[in-house]
Amino acid sequence: MLILAGLGNPEPTHRLNRHNIGFIAVDEIIRRYAFSGGKMKFKGWLYDGMIGTEKAMVIKPQTYMNKSGECLAAACQFYKVSPENLLVFYDELDLPQGKIKVKQGGGNAGHNGLRSIDAHLGENYWRIRIGIGHPGRKDLVHSYVLSNFTTNEQDSLASLIKDIAEHITVLMSGDANGFMNKLSQTKKLLSKPLSTD
């Protein structure tokens, strides 16, 4: 079994924040593969279902970003899932908006969510870095990551998020390069922006 975790902040007002791209990504996976309705467990929303022939769980920690590791460590321990079978989706300032990089292990690059996960589980989990771009100045970072995507950004984002969900089985098989290739080959055509309901 795999655990797919999205990182974000829990309040509804943060729903379309750049910092919440991890939540946005796993929400589409939940929708596309008709995962069960969520239940609160391990200080997070937990959903279960099948992706292809693989049993999977999606977790959205509700602890705020800097305590994400508490939730994920509890879930991994309970379900006996090793860090190698944990996929974490999160925002990456140092990647241009819409770019994706996937890696197993590595540093946290100052990301508070990853720092918390590293402290609780070590570094050997999969990281799906979703680029949100950089505001250009360090003093603008805090307000930038907590601001909403613009309408135009939501358009391209919606297409990217659908592509991630469509091709997630490739990554779940352990083929990170194949997953990134699939995303780069897919044309980013959009029918509508993300819902703000």
Protein language model features and the residues they cover:
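Nucleotide and nucleotide-moiety/phosphate-recognizing core
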Residues: 2-105, 115-128, 135-140, 155-197
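Short, loop-centered acidic/histidine patches that primarily coordinate divalent metals
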Residues: 130-133, 149
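Short glycine-enriched, charge-decorated loop/helix-capping segments at active-site entrances
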Residues: 101-107, 145-149
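Hydrophobic alpha-helical segments within soluble ligand-binding/sensing domains
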Residues: 109-113
